[in-house]
């Protein structure tokens, strides 16, 4: 269980308690070339600070090579157990016969777990460790872990604790935020006193019209509370490849990802940060704090 102490996470990072700190985090690297190209350009521009990689996906080798050649890039793993696209699919890293409950009749991850209630927690751990080992073997040195579609966060205590166990084994922090505690109380009871817990999260909501995209993010920045907030984004280029890969729906599709890319590499975002006295940080900083907490035995609030 998370135990409160006098120090906030911001203070553990060396900032005053009232500081407003954000991680701008790009999800889904490795999914397509258009996502990889947009996300890495955004990272290099400096306003997107962190990202996570999908090891089972077809374009993971490309982003793994990028990680090797850019060792300072703040990259984690986007632990993946679903394959939500209609025609663009992926399956397990572990041998199929070791994780049968995770795979459909064609050997792909399920589109949606709601259609399969037989997910085996032991097989989930086998697959998560396989993804970790594949990434490490290809030169990726992750700074953190998170969960594609939040499946490991929001699918019950047992699977969350599998993710937590894997994270502890590899000495990595995971993306979890206090915003989720009310709806998923097992998160708070499962986390240990030395686990990193972010304060808030922001992500684009389905149904926001394209013309309201900047307003949504600018409002979130104006209303930002003190503490550490992760803004989860999904950058990509609205090109033929990404349109084909995501054609079954507009949500998190090619145009959606282009809008995220445009806003977070544009002047409006840069000016908003300066105007609101908001500081960009990375998961690498949190990873160092996590290592320090584990070594010292101190606790964050």
Predicted regions and their residues:
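Catalytic domains of cell-wall/extracellular-matrix polysaccharide-remodeling enzymes
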Residues: 121, 125-213, 222
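C-terminal domain-boundary segment and adjacent tail
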Residues: 174-177, 249-301
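Active-site beta-loop-alpha junctions enriched in small/polar residues
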Residues: 29, 56, 78-84, 148-150, ...
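A short alpha/beta connector and helix-capping loop motif
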Residues: 33-58
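Acidic (Asp/Glu)-rich catalytic clusters
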Residues: 12-14, 39-45, 62-74, 91-104, ...
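Structural preference for beta-strand elements that scaffold enzyme active sites
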Residues: 21-23, 48-52, 72-78, 142-146, ...
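N-terminal pre-catalytic segment of deacetylase/amide-hydrolase enzymes
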Residues: 1-23
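Active-site gating loops and adjacent loop-to-helix segments of metal-dependent hydrolytic enzymes
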Residues: 90-115, 246-253
């Amino acid at each position: 269980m998370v135990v409160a102490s006098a120090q906030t996470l911001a203070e553990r990072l060396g900032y005053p308690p009232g500081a407003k700190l954000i991680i701008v985090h790009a999800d889904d690297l490795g999914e397509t070339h258009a996502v990889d190209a947009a996300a890495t350009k955004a990272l290099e521009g400096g306003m997107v600070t962190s990202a996570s990689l999908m090891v089972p996906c077809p374009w993971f080798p490309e982003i793994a090579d990028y990680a090797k050649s850019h060792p300072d890039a703040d990259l984690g793993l986007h632990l993946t157990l679903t394959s939500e696209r209609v025609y663009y699919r992926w399956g397990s890293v572990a041998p199929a016969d070791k994780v049968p409950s995770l795979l459909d009749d064609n050997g792909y991850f399920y589109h949606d777990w709601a259609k399969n209630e037989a997910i085996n927690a032991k097989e989930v751990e086998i697959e998560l460790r396989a993804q970790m080992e594949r990434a490490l073997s290809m030169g990726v040195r992750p700074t953190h872990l998170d969960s594609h579609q939040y499946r490991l966060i929001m699918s019950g205590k047992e699977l969350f604790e599998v993710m937590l166990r894997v994270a502890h084994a590899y000495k990595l922090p995971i993306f979890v935020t206090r915003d989720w505690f009310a709806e998923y109380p097992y998160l708070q009871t499962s986390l240990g006193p030395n686990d990193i817990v972010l304060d808030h999260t922001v992500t684009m909501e389905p149904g926001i019209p394209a013309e309201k995209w900047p307003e949504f993010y600018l409002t979130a920045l104006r209303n930002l509370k003190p503490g550490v907030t992760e803004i989860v984004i999904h950058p990509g280029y609205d090109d033929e490849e990404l349109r084909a890969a995501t054609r079954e729906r507009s949500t998190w599709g090619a145009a959606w990802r282009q809008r995220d890319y445009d806003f977070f590499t544009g002047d409006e975002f840069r000016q908003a940060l300066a105007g609101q006295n908001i500081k960009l940080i990375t998961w690498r900083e949190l990873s160092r704090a996590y290592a320090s907490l584990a070594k010292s035995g101190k606790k964050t609030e």
